[in-house]
């Protein structure tokens, strides 16, 4: 009996150290809309991780005071954006970190580079592999990866294109370089699928996306839909096309009378988690997934809006 108590106490006292940060809040990103979405994602997961154990996070100097009183949160202050990679390496070298998760954009290989750093240390990455980010973070490479498995908009290779009016005169045109690609416009319902990807692929929820001329302005999480199972199946087929997707993955979908179109695969945490309520929490599911444990969960969803 005493031996059993000792084992239980030892198990309870094991501290798990989680490195978690969101790039906009760590870099002091100037775009207020990006910061707002970044904070929504960060705050949601931070509270969940802190319910599990101790968290270390990188925060830009202007935001530190907002989190200074959080129990079990260790803050590493960032003064300039170019400090982030070195601070991350230093933490991974000096701290006994068990798990790491970075929320960052795919732009300019930011998420890819930060993930490569995490992968070079003996910690469990709760997110996607750098290999998967390299593909899913590039819209054309994603198209090439999934086009034979699922419906997706016709997409042309990224190269220089000229766009001009059919009946214009005077040589007026717009020139687009290799940073742009041309893709067929698909009209229909803007939806997304939230999944956890590991040894199995678990769809968490089907979500409605609110999109207007300002961009993504909110959503409704865990909706019912007559095609829900079929949409889940198409999202799973797309995810299977890219090796190394792991943890939380978001798949953007458009549904119309012609079928179910896979638009993008997001190899990272998305703003949708703000309205996603799982039991156990998403943070706990990510850790269980990293440890190859069987996942059992219940899902509820909420509507949310982003004031832009």
From Swiss-Prot:
It is an enzyme of class 6 (ligase). InterPro entries: ATP-grasp (IPR011761), ATP-grasp_PylC-type (IPR003806), MfnD (IPR024710), MfnD_preATP-grasp (IPR040803), Tyramine-Glutamate_Synthase (IPR053510). Pathway: Cofactor biosynthesis; methanofuran biosynthesis. Pfam families: ATP-grasp_3, preATP-grasp_3. Binds 2 magnesium or manganese ions per subunit. GO terms for molecular function: ATP binding; ligase activity; metal ion binding. Mg(2+) 1 binds at residues 252, 264. Mn(2+) 2 binds at residues 264, 266. It comes from the Archaea. Its cofactor is Mg(2+); Mn(2+). It catalyses: tyramine + L-glutamate + ATP = gamma-L-glutamyltyramine + ADP + phosphate + H(+). Its EC number is 6.3.4.24. ATP binds at residues 115-192. Mg(2+) 2 binds at residues 264, 266. Residues 89-291 form the ATP-grasp domain. The keyword Ligase applies. Mn(2+) 1 binds at residues 252, 264. Catalyzes the formation of an amide bond between tyramine and the gamma carboxy group of L-glutamate. The enzyme also accepts phenylethylamine in vitro. This is Tyramine--L-glutamate ligase.
